[in-house]
Amino acid sequence: MLKAVLKKSREGGKGSKKEAGGDFGSETPALSSSGDSPVNSLSTTEDTYRVSLAKGVSMSLPSSPLLPRQSLLTQSRSNKKSPGPVRKPKYVESPRVPGDPVMIPFGEGSKPSEPSATEAKADNEPSCSPAAQELLTRLGFLLGEGIPSATHITIEDKNEAMCTALSQGISPCSTLTSSTASPSTDSPCSTLNSCVSKTAASKSPCETISSPSSTLESKDSGIIATITSSSENDDRSGSSLEWNRDGSLRLGVQKGVLHDRRADNCSPVAEEETTGSAESVLPKAEPSAGDGPVPYPQSSGSLIMPRPNSVAATSSTKLEDLSYLDGQRNAPLRTSIRLPWHNTAGGRAPEVKARFAPYKPQEILLKPLLFEVPSITTDSVFVGRDWLFHQIEENLRNTELAENRGAVVVGSVGFGKTAIISKLVALSCHGSRMRQIASSSPSLSPKSSDPTQDLPGTPLLSPSSSTSALSVTRTPAGPGTADSQRPREDAVKYLASKVVAYHYCQADNTYTCLVPEFVHSIAALLCRSHQLAAYRDLLIKEPQLQSMLSLRSCVQDPVAAFKRGVLEPLTSLRNEQKIPEEEYIILIDGLNEAEFHKPDYGDTLSSFITKIIPKFPTWLKLIVTVRANFQEIISALPFVKLSLDDFPDNKDIHSDLHAYVQHRVHSSQDILSNISLNGKADAALISKVSSHLVLRSLGSYLYLKLTLDLFQRGHLVIKSASYKVVPVSLSELYLLQCNMKFMTQSAFDRALPILNVALASLHPMTDEQIFQAINAGHIQGEQGWEDFQQRMEALSCFLIKRRDKTRMFCHPSFREWLVWRADGESTAFLCEPRNGHALLAFMFSRQESKLNRQQTMELGHHILKAHIFKGLSKKTGVSSSHLQALWIGYSTEGLSAALASLRNLYTPNVKVSRLLILGGANVNYRTEVLNNAPILCVQSHLGHEEVVTLLLEFGACLDGMSENGMNALCYAAAAGHMKLVCLLIKKGARVDHLDKKGQCALVHSALRGHSDILQYLLNCEWSAGPPQPGTLRKSQALQQALTAAASMGHSSVVQSLLGMAEEHEIEVNGTDTLWGETALTAAAGRGKVEICELLLERGAAVSRANRRGVPPLFCAARQGHWQVVRLLLDRGCDVNLSDKQGRTPLMVASCEGHLSTVEFLLSKGAALSSLDKEGLSALSWACLKGHRAVVQYLVEEGAEIDQTDKNGRTPLDLAAFYGDAETVLYLVEKGAVIEHVDHSGMRPLDRAIGCRNTAVVVTLLRKGAKLGNAAWAMATSKPDILIILLQKLVEEGNVMYKKGKMKEAAQRYQYALRKFPREGLGEDMRPFNELRVSLYLNLSRCRRKTNDFGLAEEFASKALELKPKSYEAFYARARAKRNSRQFLAALADLQEAVKLCPNNQEIKRLLARVEEECKQLQRNQQQKQQGPPPAPANDSDNEEDAPASSLKDHFPIEEAEEEDTSSQEESISPTPRSQPPPSVPSPYIRNLQEGLQSKGRSASPQSRAGISKSLRETVAQSGLVMQPTKQAQIVKTNQHLGSGQSSMRNSSTKIQVSSQNPPPSPMPGRVSAAPAVSRNQHLEGTGPFTAGTGCGHFGDRLGASQSLQLQRSESGTAYPLPSKVKAAERLLAHASVAVDMAPPNQGGPVSCSDVRHPASLSSSGSSGSPSSSIKMSSSTSSLTSSSSVSDGFKVQGPDSRIRDKGTTQVQGGTAEHRPRNTPFMGIMDKTARFQQQSNPPNRSWHCPVAEGLLTNTATAAGLQSNSEKPTLKPGGYCSQAKPCSVPPLSMGVHNGAQVKELEENKCQIPALCQDNRITKGVPHLYPEGVSKQPLHVSTEAHRSHLTSAKPKRSFIESNV
């Protein structure tokens, strides 16, 4: 039989299993087949899948929720087709199913996939980021696409390979399916067998849709559970895969494998706290091999707790497997409260889309179990019980009551206990959880739902919960009037408002009955309680708390996990008043159910609560329910007991039952008609029937519910007044229901195997799993799927399908009725669970893939329970135990791993463990805990005597050691297990064995204070003679034990050891060979005052030092134990005793920062002034270690503050070295010398910089520390320090600026600029650039104050290059330009500033002034057309600016302007830019625009107005920006505008307009359209020129103006030089014509305007297209200047101006210029610094490009023909002017460098330089040097004749 079952039925048995390579569930196309069932080539139909189920293909039984579900075997083994749709297998071991997508999209069957191909791919595919995965997953749900399941791994590799929780990288925390998440079959959290059908038809009840939330909701799968590679059976019934509301299965996200090596340091150490098993809370996570993030590692170990009937053994899933829990968590009640929106058939629900929460991973990794109570449905009504809630409330509020820690509701089966709990949950903050898992009530099939949980459950879900509009209605039968009921009804709401967590125990779902899951789930629910939001926040902030609550930690030490992870944090939060001062309640239902799974070792839920309740804070209460016949399990709880059993006596119970019957009768016409004899039901009849039913019920709501259900469905009709037809008990009700369902015995026999399997299973099973189990018992003639479905349908009223597609018994009482009957009751329909165990065992045995640890434990459990070989031993001669061992050995290869699984270690199942060992498990197998200790060591540590005996019986090695060298005896001695120590010694364990720390068992017992074990070990035989390696003599061990006991404060052990001193050669002053301590130094260092006193009394020497030479006094002082110090001083120690380094106890205490010890020592006369061998005092040591309180105390006590050591270091030096700024500040304030230099030349500041102590650097600088060369040298490559030092320089400059010392301020700024680091700091350069901007602005203000307007403008432009959006820089530059009379350019800058900071009033004020000045200029120009206007007074502004203080605020521009003797000082601070910058030009600007209209008119004075108008309009249209280059602007300061230039300016405007259409570029100097218009209007339309302007000057000006245009062009791209040259050549021809035609102007000389007009005509033609326009990039890289600005130019410009002096009006008020020889900020040219200090009265603004072109023209034509007085040398003039037409200009050039560079770079071009080649090369030769060369002009000569344009200025100051 065994052979047949194991071999034949498995078709290939082990062989095929091995061939599969251990990929459980791997879908290999070629399966070995047995002869009778030919292999069907990968048939993907549902039928074949069913067949494979029938054949026993690999499918895991429902197992621990810990484990992911096992995937279904894929190929069917026979050709038979099973009609049912198939559910796809959920992979047990691995989170990812190799072949198919885990989920079948809602309602769609997943497409068949080629398993082997997919399988190979699955493991190798890299996963995308969790966020992306989550998104894809969600899209998949929305679009109905399947999502690939997680990778799978071979099972046996599971020992170390554990799956982690993120399959596919999906975030485990997503709240995809609201908060109730249960793992998908694929998820490690799910315990269901994975059996998602490959082609599940949409109607298939089995099809699953996975939604990524199982583990999505909690990362626990990671923390707690690394799933062993074996998929533990996912079916933990409670965990049932979590289904979406639409019935879709949630995908568990487990992915990746990780070898989790737990760091369990349980080995004892000489520490105060013994390390508990909880230490190994967080295993080290190794990167998972799979794709996808690996949250927390878990190690594998089976962890299921045994129950009396070995259930726990079967649950031994590996701890890692605990991820199963994840699936369970988050679930609401264990009630299936079926709400209408839940489709039990698993179809697609309409609200799927609405439920997708925004993707945001949760940080909480804990997940509550998913509870479903099948009996609570939407048609359940909850009536009454107000009296009960009222009593509970009163008792819990009664503070005087000793039993007010909680309440126990006691009642018999079916009395409504679960419904009471569910009612409270439904009204609590977790009510939504309950509603989420509710499903619609299964049609009207007679459902024996538990009233206990159900009846009282209508509004159970709260009124909104169900379609059956059953609300909490009170019938007249209810007790009391409405008034009296009011407070009672309030009681339930009050209690519900206090509920923060809940738990349901269900016997048929093992995991709900285990303590670790209880702790983890309660913690997860507490996090989700809105009253305890602070607790959630705390867990997020402190991940170690979450790891303490991980399932792994809960398995290892549930008491410590609950205490440290829940109770202590809650208490501390309450003390901090972060939790409201209220009482809170935890609900626990059905404690008696948990007793069914009582482990061999460890607590049941009731014993755990009894143990932990004393640690509960008084404000945290429990309400628990228990059956009346199990009251003894809660007898020790300090709870008030409320009984539901005193039925006849308690009128409230009577009233509740009546109210329920009345409610049901009145709400159903069917019941009314069936209880009336004549079809009429009057009140009296109803009352009579009600009384009869209530009397029969004996208080059971379940009885009433089931009976009224029969009336409602017409199965019972009252025929006589005797009511004989009404069943009298629950047993009769169940018998009646079964008789109605199974009319014949054969009908019941067909259903019997299904019931047997359901009774035997540890978890709820899906239909596929049950189908597989049923067929596992057949070798031939398997049951068909359709036939099976019919049988399941017949049982659907007894086996309720839950939302996760698993089946649970309708009520615990029905389950019990099927197995057991009271005496005298009918035995019909009794079931035999043993047969169910056999079928489940066969199912596991026939599974093709390897069994994981969890499944192996379950297989052992079922084999033992089935006991199929009973009675065969006599026939076969082989004992049944050996046959069972043979069975399990043939069925799985993971026996050793299962034996060492985590749960089987901490809550071992002894019987299953014995079976595993008999089957061949290795008793010396290494575990994953206690440093990979062998099983014997772990069991010795845990004190499991029975298991240790079992292991020793089978030959476990006594000398087996963990990685730290401890053997079983050491662990037993350290843990204090006396019996195990005796057992191990008797079996031959070595007493003198040393671990890797050199400690023997004797020392371990002494460290932990186990004197009885120490005595026992001393009496054992120790090896005589010289100790062997790894051993030691007894005397050495005793000396070590004395030191160990003294250090830990175990006085009883010390006394007993000292009592044996003579007998065993123990010396009280001896040093041990292990730590080198004496007993007194060890005790003193640990602060054990009592032990010190004891040792001193026994003769310990006060001055005896340890092996390192440290006396007891120093040990105590170093650790701050002043009480021990006092004791030792009292016993004669010298307070100023010094050690080998000359240090005193005071120095040691100061060094460690123990203030109380320092105070005590000083009070005892310790010397403050004593120095050690290095010259350090106590104060020096305190400063060196940064103990501010000690420093302060010592200084106050008179310590010398400037005491130097042998290296010349003072305490301040040492404090600066350490880096505590407050200590440094304190010392400085107390008079420490801040500039003290030690022997190495270092000052405190240098030390702080060297150590990068920025806070100290800042403090010292504030206190006046000087910056020397050493400081700058130390700051090299330390950007954070360097920026502080530079800011210090800026602050010094700012102080001088405010004092009016402009020169000194500029020097500081300049010095700071020299100290800037070179490029290369990357991101660190940002703050430096900000600071550089600040410095440039400060320098700009300084130069403006000293009337160096050109430099002021230049520095502002530099600031703009670094920070193009700086409104302060625009403002500063506008101020400089305005001072140099460049009103239009100033206007443009101000408009940019207004754009950037529209609300700044100061900018607006200045803008208004400049606009007014422009209008005035326009009026002056018009007047000048008739004659030279009088020179206006110099309008220079005096400003008081506060320099920029830091790189963050370039100090508000505090620029005060004095206009006409009234000075204003206002700061421009950044203001919100809410208003857009003004885009409408001012009236003045509009007037200017009108002048741009006529483009080709004659330039005679009469037509100037029209030309200017046309120019203005053109400019306005093109949005050009006219801002002169820096050189041009500076030159303009000294130039006066001639009246005859406007026409030529107009023509040049046209050129500029065409060239300025490109989009604005972000360069600092550019301005956008609106400001551009106004600027152009100033430039072009204004500025009358005096009649006598010389053409030479005009040419100069044109060169400058061209450079201006070139630089200011908007496009930012430089056109090639040849086009410029050509344009210039074209202009030459026109120029000569213009000279000839020009009519003489007033005063004789030819007006420049006359010359300009023809050029304008010609240039206008060429300027129409961008290609011919002359436009240059303004970037600094294209900076060029005319190479022709030579010395000759410098001479002739002034020459001509001087000659014209008679016709020119000289502007007065020129400031005195003091040329410099030294460069200023790299600017060598004096012209740049001086030239702008006098402001010419009238200036005409013109288009730079055109004027530049005209310059060439005029030059070529020979301006000598002009009737101007001076005769210019053609060559000289050409060399000056011509190059100006070509080179591009940029704003970023330093003025000072221009002349110098030009001269060095062959700037001087021969006299008649008309060859364009030279000019072509210039831009490339001089990119920077030439851009800013102002026309060299004398401030005294012909100011009114000078054009405002300036050629590249390389000379200026020489003529000033």
UniProtKB/Swiss-Prot annotation:
| SUPFAM superfamilies membership | Ankyrin repeat, TPR-like
- ANK repeats sit at 893-925, 931-960, 964-993, 997-1026, 1037-1066, 1075-1104, 1108-1137, 1141-1170, 1174-1203, 1207-1236, 1240-1269
Biased composition, Acidic residues: where in the chain? 1454-1463
- Free-text description of this protein's post-translational modifications in UniProt: Phosphorylated; by MINK1 and TNIK upon stimulation by RAP2A.
Region entry Disordered, spans? 1-45, 58-130, 203-222, 262-296, 437-489, 1417-1597, 1636-1720, 1832-1856
The UniProt keywords, alphabetically, are: Acetylation, ANK repeat, Phosphoprotein, Repeat, Synapse, TPR repeat
PROSITE patterns assigned: ANK_REP_REGION (PS50297), ANK_REPEAT (PS50088), TPR (PS50005), TPR_REGION (PS50293)
Feature: compositional bias, Basic and acidic residues: 8-21
Known function: May be a scaffold component in the postsynaptic density.
How does this polypeptide assemble, per the annotation? Interacts probably directly with DLG1, DLG4, HOMER1. Interacts with DLGAP1, INA, CAMK2A, GRIN2B and GRIA1. Interacts with TNIK and MINK1.
* Membership in a protein family: Belongs to the TANC family.
Q: What is this protein called?
A: Protein TANC1
Specify the species.
Mus musculus
